[in-house]
Amino acid sequence: MANKRNYQKELDAKIAGLHGEVPTLLLHSCCAPCSSYVLEYLSQYFSITLFYYNPNIYPPTEYEHRVEEQQRLIHSLPAVHPISFCPGPYDSDRFYKLTRGMENVPEGGERCFVCYEMRLREAAEMAKQLKLDYFTTTLSISPLKNAEKLNEIGERLAAEYGIPYLNSDFKKRGGYQRSIELSPVSYTHLT
């Protein structure tokens, strides 16, 4: 049996290899609470474009609320390097079309994986369009999200789009707990 990959160690090695350079990163964010720690951490090493694209959120008013909360967080969070905001389109029809027939699949199953790929594909496309150095997602911070599957999808899309995927498991080293500390009580949902 192969050893399980340690994505946090891979991220540590990538950061150590930057040697003080500040590359650009497209960071897909699922929500403000999950992005709080990730932004605090990665803004030390990257100039970040935060990409909010989550057509799985319903209704549209909730989506807009989350966009506003994401922007508020970016403006209130001290960052070492710049963080800009890039909203993606709200296209819930795409999500429902891709997951049709999977409505009863439990959390952590194939429906989640389809949703991961939909969001990461859009992130890879945006990173390529903006000519950024890397892309990644905040999704791995959640204890409910499968970091191995997220990184597998990210690596596959990196090869397809020619933009390196920044492997990660942000829940490691207390990342999830730190995101709770950084987020107001009303933010304790994880998407």
Residue spans for each PLM region:
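Conserved small/polar residues in nucleotide/adenosyl-binding loops
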Residues: 188-191
